Amino acid sequence: MCIRDRGKLKELDIPFMYVGDYLEESPLGKAEWLVALSEVIGKRAEGEKVFAEIPVRYNVLKKKVADNILDAPSVMLNTPYGDSWFMPSTESYVARLIKDAGGDYIYKKNTGNASAPIDLEEAYLLASQADMWLHVGMANTLDELKAACPKFIDTRCFRGGQVYNNNARTNAAGGNDYY
């Protein structure tokens, strides 16, 4: 729903709230949205309890990685959408997740606060230099990724099988915990 539609929602007395978790630059800031969403369903105390444990666990893992990483692997993200490939900002929560997990986000040009489109040629160059490739759209297998991005099968990360998606838990409609 567009922001301009909020007047209609008010007119119809339909409650609404804006959820801006996608604007968060910190993974912990993004996680904290569970408190706001818990409030919506009348379970704020439970949301606060769950969230209180997240920073502790996150920071323990972050320190464990920092103490053990010798050489940060370069990380490529995403797949094309139409003729563009959208790359997150270096200040985004996903870039921060990569850093905190011991990786090096490969796209350094976008320092703004939103994802930026790049052309497929630049994406190919980045993927060719990357040690691993994450968030590969709807692809569940390398064969599915090959069908979606046939020009990228000769990149180092594809050839080496260093391609990972955030689809460990999905429902029948394809939804998952990440999105």
Located regions from the model:
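Internal alpha/beta domain cores that form substrate/cofactor-binding pockets in large enzymes
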Residues: D5-P27, Y105-G112, I118
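Structured C-terminal subdomain patch of bacterial secreted/periplasmic proteins
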Residues: E24-E48, H135-Y179
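Short helices/loops that flank or line small-molecule/ion binding pockets
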Residues: I118-Q129
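His/Asp/Glu-enriched short active-site or ligand-binding loop at hydrolase and phosphoryl-transfer sites
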Residues: V94-A114, G137, Q162-N167
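Conserved small/polar residues in nucleotide/adenosyl-binding loops
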Residues: M1-I3
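Extracytoplasmic/secreted envelope proteins and their assembly/folding machinery
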Residues: R6-L9, A31-S38, G47-F51, P55-Y58, ...
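Loop/turn elements at helix/coil->beta-strand transitions in domains of secreted/extracellular proteins
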Residues: L12-P15, L37, R44, I69-V75, ...
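Basic- and aromatic-lined ligand-binding clefts that recognize polyanionic substrates
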Residues: E46-A101
